[in-house]
Amino acid sequence: MVTVGSFLSPDEAERLRVFERQRHDTLATSYHDFFTAVTTRAIDPLLRAVCAESDFKLLDVATGPGSLAAEAARRGVRCTGVDLSSGMIQLARKSNPGIDFRVADVEHLPFADGSFDAVVCNFGLGHFPYPEAAVAECIRTLRKGGRVAFSWWSDPSKQRIQGLFREAIAEVGAAPPPDIPVGHSVYRFADTGEFTRLLEGAGLVEACVENHQTEHPIPDLETLWRGGLGSLALTASAIGHQNAATQTAIRAALKRRAQAYRPSAGYILPMAFKIGAGEKP
């Protein structure tokens, strides 16, 4: 699978932003159809991590189709959602017309200092060109004493939806496609130490990282295959640029590896993620 470097030049960072924006514009609907059911597993832990209460002002960064913002609103929280992808924001607005959704870059949030009681980001961290800058900007918009929380994936050996695709691509030896940018490793924050250092380095107090593990059912291989291609930006690009024979080989490798998680008719895939949180002093 594609691994990207740890440090980006400004040109590489912009290339990554363009890739992420364009890919998620394209994948917005198919992402929602398949992957929202996966990412919503982290919503309740995130809201608990920031002690979200009724009438809190909450910022949801990398809101995607707006699922976390919608759940927060159901709990009486006043939520604003932002995302780099206009396609995702259009989908979020359509699904949740009563919530304020805006297109915005996490490194340049259009809010005054201390605007929010809490900030959350559900599986956005590994998509940002400069995670340290993104976290700092989130904290800037947070009031003193407010809390911020980020979710990100655990190692692919534990997070098997992405892990199975990653391993199948590597097994076949598929060459990285030219449109995948050089960037940071998407699994940098699968390491608890790296995640903790990110939070502490941003000046947060009581920073902690917790592990969460669950399972996700998928009825058949076709759903897994189409879901991955329709939801995972790097995976979709990596596979989409291969010739037909290589794509067939990747699918065969995926099927063989997924058999370990097929107790009966469908698949039960382990999924694991981390919640990193802290308080603004």
Each language-model region and where it sits:
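Class I SAM-dependent methyltransferase SAM/SAH-binding core
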Residues: K57-L109, A118, A133
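Conserved Class I S-adenosyl-L-methionine
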Residues: S9-A13, P65-S67, S185-P281
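Conserved catalytic/acceptor-binding region of the Class I
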Residues: E132, R140-P219, N243
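Conserved class I S-adenosyl-L-methionine
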Residues: V2-F56, S67-E71, M88-L91, S95
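A structural alpha-helix within SAM-dependent methyltransferase catalytic domains
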Residues: L47, A70-A73, E132-I139, R166
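A short SAM/SAH-binding and catalytic strip from SAM-dependent methyltransferases
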Residues: A118-E132, S154
